[in-house]
């Protein structure tokens, strides 16, 4: 098992919007509200930036859009299927992902920062080109205000690989070469090292500021429950030290004043 728990400084993504107001995704724990970036968003960014989705094939069957999977195109020879699939074209076949992510949850309690914007430049251009008085006929020119919550903060997420499952597709008794398995894992790890995320025009340097992990035998997010950062300070506990001293686990961090 290859396991990592990561601290990074990233923007939250957004849930449902109400009119022109957008809210960041949040979770409720320990009696408090924390902003998040969903594991689906994290996984999609990693798969896309790593090139793992470069060979993705998609089919639409009875208005259902899904990854294409056949006996000739499966997880052993298609990188895009490494993250798991369910295909219902003929018989339903399901393959679980060989790696799992958690949501990236803020280390500190959510503080609402609302940003207000409008499309004044576009509306002014339309009004000028069509002889409209913007002040008198703002609606006709398409002038529209909008607002959204904003959160960029330290967040924690974990990623765990089941190395025995990488490149293996039991639905078709197929398995990738060892070199292909190594390449897939390295592509994902290298992408996490240099990850960038975009939401509402914000480009985040989502590289790990601090990372705990290594290779061990525990098939779970091994450090997820013992890595606790509050107000940019890591809580060093006996349990954290004990786990770092087991097997081939290490800690690394960037001295960047974050």
Regions found by a protein language model. Give the residues of each.
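RNA-binding basic/glycine-rich loop and surface signature characteristic of RAMP-family CRISPR effectors
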Residues: 1-258
């Amino acid at each position: 098992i290859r396991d990592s728990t990561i601290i990074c400084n990233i923007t939250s993504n957004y849930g449902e919007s109400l009119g022109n107001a957008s809210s960041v995704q949040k979770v409720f724990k320990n009696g408090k509200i924390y902003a998040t970036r969903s594991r689906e968003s994290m996984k999609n960014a990693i798969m896309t930036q790593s090139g793992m989705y470069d060979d993705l094939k998609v089919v639409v069957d009875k208005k259902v859009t899904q990854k294409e999977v056949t006996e000739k195109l499966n997880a052993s020879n298609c990188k895009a299927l490494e993250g798991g699939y369910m295909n219902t074209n003929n018989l339903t076949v399901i393959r679980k992902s060989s790696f799992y992510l958690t949501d990236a949850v803020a280390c500190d309690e959510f503080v609402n920062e609302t940003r207000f914007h409008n499309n004044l430049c576009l509306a002014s251009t339309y009004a000028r080109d069509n002889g409209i008085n913007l002040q008198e006929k703002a609606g006709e020119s398409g002038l529209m205000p909008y607002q959204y919550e904003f959160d960029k903060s330290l967040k924690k997420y974990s990623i765990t690989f089941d190395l025995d499952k990488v490149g293996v597709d039991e639905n078709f008794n197929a398995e990738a070469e060892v070199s292909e398995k190594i390449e897939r894992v390295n592509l994902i790890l290298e992408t996490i090292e240099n990850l960038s995320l975009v939401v509402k025009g914000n480009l985040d340097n989502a590289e790990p500021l601090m990372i705990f992990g290594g290779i061990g035998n525990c098939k779970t997010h091994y450090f997820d429950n013992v890595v606790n950062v509050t107000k940019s300070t890591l809580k060093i506990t006996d349990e954290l030290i004990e786990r770092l001293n087991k097997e081939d686990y290490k800690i690394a961090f960037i001295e960047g004043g974050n």
